[in-house]
């Protein structure tokens, strides 16, 4: 989007791979979804997709989705379909080939694999953060649920020579076949 460079600068030290839709002004959100799916295809068994304004679902919701055994699933809270959406790798080609009418929701409705809707008690799955007040309320709820380990590995001789930044550089160099593009 229009703030991609700013977001990338703020998040660059977090081990994130950034993908851009350079035609964001003239395309739909589903086109951006497809860019991400193309990149992730065959790199993992399942992915979890969420729009940027629905970031604060809980780890418990993620575990419920992953443990469901479904190839296509989403959480339901307060009678509403939410995020993240679980998509198995084998469904990515079908979604990429979809016409895009009604976006990802339409593609899931047309998918040959039925969507499993799973009830969860997690308001973060259905409430977006469009305003500062929305975001503050979601952050408060999310932080009350938050417990997570953080692990970092580096190799050191006299000075550290391999850390998460070098690992990311090597991953991106392998992906792009270019240090410059990485």
Place the predicted regions along the sequence by residue.
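Short alpha-helical "packing" element that flanks the helix-turn-helix/winged-helix DNA-binding module
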Residues: 169-170
